[in-house]
Amino acid sequence: MTITDLVLILFIAALLVYALYDQFIMPRRNGPTLLSIALLRRGRVDSVIFVGLVAILIYNNVTSHGAQMTTWLLSALALMGFYIFWIRTPRIIFKQRGFFFANVWIEYNRIKEMNLSEDGVLVMQLEQRRLLIRVHNIDDLEKIYKLLIENQ
């Protein structure tokens, strides 16, 4: 096993841990989930570049008769990238005392100001940061509003 294979195993393990945390652990942290809303995905250009580069590496490894283990590891990395970028949907998860946004826990008392833009983006101003929440379904904004009013 080469150093390249070890690095690939490390990246695959990191992506797998992230996917498991995002899918199974995060919704169970900090109490019961009150509301979970699907968000719009960001631009997919980065993901296309990543998966494309991994596909080029797979092709290069196969044509140069590289190690079969490396080909399988590159394929697993491409599948993990495909899952994380295209199959998994980003979510905002509301709890009793706060919410998870982009895998970060934010307490409700940190929200200083909230606005709704014309194009349906909920803008939350925190102490030093602005959150732009783009929901998949525009009707979910009303659910978020009701939940925030009930918990304030």
From Swiss-Prot:
It is a multi-pass membrane protein. The keyword DNA-binding does not apply. It is found in: Cell inner membrane. GO terms for cellular component: plasma membrane. The chain crosses the membrane at residues 6-26, 45-65, 67-87. InterPro entries: DUF986. Keywords: Cell inner membrane, Cell membrane, Membrane, Transmembrane, Transmembrane helix. Its main location: membrane. It comes from the Bacteria. Pfam families: DUF986 (PF06173). Belongs to the UPF0266 family. HAMAP family: UPF0266 (MF_01071). This is UPF0266 membrane protein YobD. It comes from Salmonella paratyphi A (strain AKU_12601).
